């Protein structure tokens, strides 16, 4: 049986969702895994459809990680570039996301010290290849089984837009909302639901961001949703 160290976060954020799906496949392939959780031991609160056997399995492979520690066992790490300079053992393979177009010297060095780096996009991989990194390739993400089409019928008369992701300047959240409002605002044929809560902002800061995005006007076809706690709730929204 092949052995693997898997170092990744288990939580409701984007990296956490990808980590859980990696674990699903690794378990299916019967890989002998030692789980090294980044951060908390494992927060499965968002994964309300996952059975208890899977949760118990992850707890078991996390509890045994130090007893099975071997520097020759390859490691698959799922994390940001910043923080991936720390490795488990001799051969670390990194899966990461990169959203910029100008890698820093530090980022290039971190990539070069990995055995191999898998990026989720071709553009990111090519960007680092141009900086002299020969140990990079592309592995696009697959489909998350938690998200699927539901048999329930929803309103077919209204064209529904969804904006999902933390409210951040780098994501141009405010600009996107205002662009949509300038084109479709108060038009009953269109609806926009925003799931953009940023847990790093307090309630007052978040409200200021919403007010600024709506230009302090009332619009009858835009909704700002509260944080959704489970993938099941997000799936309903996406449907």
Regions found by a protein language model. Name each.
Residues 196, 203-232, 236:
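Nucleotide-activated donor-binding/catalytic signature segment of Leloir-type glycosyltransferases, i.e.
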């Amino acid at each position: 049986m092949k052995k693997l160290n898997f170092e990744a976060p288990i939580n409701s954020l984007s990296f956490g969702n990808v980590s859980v799906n990696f674990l699903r496949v690794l378990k299916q392939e019967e890989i002998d895994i030692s789980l090294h959780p980044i951060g908390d031991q494992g927060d499965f609160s968002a994964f309300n459809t996952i059975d208890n056997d899977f949760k118990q399995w992850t707890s078991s492979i996390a509890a045994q990680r130090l007893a099975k520690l071997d520097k020759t066992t390859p490691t698959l790490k799922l994390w940001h570039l910043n923080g991936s300079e720390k490795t488990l053992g001799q051969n670390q393979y990194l899966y990461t996301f990169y959203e910029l177009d100008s890698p820093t010297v530090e980022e290039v060095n971190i990539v070069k010290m990995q055995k191999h780096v898998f990026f989720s996009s071709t553009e990111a991989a090519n960007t680092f290849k141009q900086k002299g990194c020969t140990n990079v390739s592309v592995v696009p993400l697959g489909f998350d089984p938690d998200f699927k089409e539901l048999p329930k019928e929803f309103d077919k008369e209204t064209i529904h837009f969804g904006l999902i992701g933390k409210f951040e300047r780098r994501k141009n959240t405010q600009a996107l909302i205002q662009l949509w409002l300038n084109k479709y605002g108060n038009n009953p044929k269109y609806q926009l639901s925003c799931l953009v809560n940023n847990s790093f902002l307090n309630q007052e800061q978040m409200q200021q961001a919403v007010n600024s995005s709506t230009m302090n006007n009332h619009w009858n076809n835009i909704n700002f949703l509260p944080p959704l706690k489970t993938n099941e709730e997000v799936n309903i929204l996406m449907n």
